């Protein structure tokens, strides 16, 4: 058994998550974690809501609530959505816990002690109308590198480069359209140039990465400069140095603290499990691989910023140093970044109304239909487009007509003719029977190898190819025509049921909810594919602060089945099954498109009204 770390990108708690988000970080990470558990490995899968930074402050101001109140609301919304999607976290927590604050401040102090954090000055954007610091991502302009319009003050989505707001050409505020002014202010900086050689050397040893991810990551080191890791803001983690720790208007930059969440969540999990040091098996052992799942817009922070923070903490940059009390931290084994998913040909944008939220699609359609679509048509290695027509087609033609119908056919024939799993009569076996069983057994190696390589689309295709071959076997053997040879009939149905069971094991990481139904349809008892649940907990260091976490029990041999062919149980009762998957009415496509158009129009009108109101306030102030 090996320890496997599965770190999942932290959704930002300024609104609900949409399908584009979970296509990048959610379903792929869960498929991988479930597979590794079935392989017998000890998986620790963590994440949480990212709750600091100026965007939450700005949104809270709009709504007339505190940042903590806004974060509390969306922490709960996001946790419920991801739990309902079946993402099997060992712990899904949040960044506003005292535990997270302590770990972040320990990281900062040791990086400072090792000489990789220093004090300097930087220009910051100020709103002329309010005098307040403007969030980097709320400033837009022309990218100075690729000259794309709409680049943000923290990053250009077109070329992927990190930016500072004062680097933008013709910058304007997204909040009210005014031109910001820039002032020098004191900040702490992470000395990325002093860490670049070690970071790049680590990158060049990476194997098995998606070429686009590795090439982009290496390209980040063509020109490396220090990055400010503090902000002029009153919402975030206090800066743990004298003269700053009590300053209400200086806080750590959200991206410095958010990536440390993987470590702090692991420590919180260990503390809640009753063994406070258990996390070290995943973080202080070089033999333990860590896999990070995200969308491609987060590559920079996971292949440059977070590794640099760990190298600085470890004392492994050009200035030397030594690790702090957390010990030497293991750098990522692999950054598994997906491309972007669009919606009906348009880029997902919550603010522009181009969106389908997780909670909305799950309220209307089965969860495994959503998971299947993301796995089969998601943006694994190239951009993909979510369309309602393709979503309905995948559900109806693949899940319902092929896989679901196969399970129902086999279970129905067994229930009708035997009422229980019949035995194999060796003398009645044919080469065709043996070939199918050999194929379904061998599929564990081929499908598993593809999941190991993070080629989940290919893995799913191979599993569904087996489903197609089982359907062909049923059609070729025609068990409904075997009237006078019960031993041959029983053998055929046993072979078919065993192959279906094997296919169900292969599909379990992708379709955990329906795999339980298939297991039961073939006479299986107990839990086949465990699901996560929500628990209400108290902050470990501030008992007055309560919040929901996603967690679960996933134990091989108890509620996790192995990644291999398990013999079905002869004599297990089988009754007439209910359909595993229901078809979606074709008219749902037009209904969803009409709903999308109506929502898009309403959101655009609301955003325009808000912007007009802001401009009116500015105009009134100038008169």
UniProtKB/Swiss-Prot annotation:
GO cellular component: cytosol
GO biological process: methionyl-tRNA aminoacylation
Keyword flag Aminoacyl-tRNA synthetase: yes
Binding site for ATP: 350
Claim: Zinc is one of the keywords in the record: yes
Cofactor, free-text remark: Binds 1 zinc ion per subunit.
Short motif 'KMSKS' region, span: 347-351
Major localization listed first in the record, in broad terms: cytoplasm
Coiled-coil segments on the chain, per record: none
Catalytic activities: tRNA(Met) + L-methionine + ATP = L-methionyl-tRNA(Met) + AMP + diphosphate
Motif 'HIGH' region: where in chain: 11-21
Subcellular location field: Cytoplasm
PANTHER family: METHIONINE--TRNA LIGASE, METHIONINE--TRNA LIGASE, CYTOPLASMIC
Role description: Is required not only for elongation of protein synthesis but also for the initiation of all mRNA translation through initiator tRNA(fMet) aminoacylation.
Full protein name: Methionine--tRNA ligase
